[in-house]
């Protein structure tokens, strides 16, 4: 990153929706990931809607708190194709997902995520699949309870 870019970023408000979108979702925007979580101030929601309208990136509201929102941003075709891969489809079916089209999966995940936020259910680890993580690593994370991984970056790697 150039010093000019760094200086520009430093002058921006951390509450700025455009900055948060760029910082948190750069791999998605660049087409390197199928999806990404975006957590930002509620006040930035309209800016995100405006920025994403007409783009190839869609969003799904996962949670809205008093001051924050959590969105799943995704490229619809890429995420649909990823979820349709046999290993991912089988994983989701084992976790109770029946209808395998993207919108039904997102709605079912929302229900499970809300139950977790309300402390009624454990964390829905299938989020890893929705974020495009390899199913082997999601299964490894569940099996090893987040420990004994080979390496960690954006996610914890359990299988080489």
Residue ranges with predicted function:
Residues 1-39:
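Short, extreme N-terminal leader segments that mark the start of a protein/domain
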Residues 22-31, 59-63, 114-118:
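Short, flexible, solvent-exposed loop/turn segments with mixed acidic/basic and small polar residues
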Residues 33, 63, 106, 142:
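Conserved catalytic core of nucleotide polymerization and phosphodiester-bond processing enzymes
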Residues 33-35, 67-69, 124-126:
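Short, surface-exposed beta-edge/turn micro-motifs
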Residues 45-105:
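A glycine-rich, hydrophobic loop/mini-helix early in the fold
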Residues 96-125:
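Internal catalytic-core helix/loop-beta-alpha segment
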Residues 123-150:
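Hydrophobic/aromatic-rich, well-ordered segments within soluble, folded domains that form packed cores
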Residues 151-160:
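Accessory, usually C-terminal, subdomains that scaffold auxiliary metal cofactors
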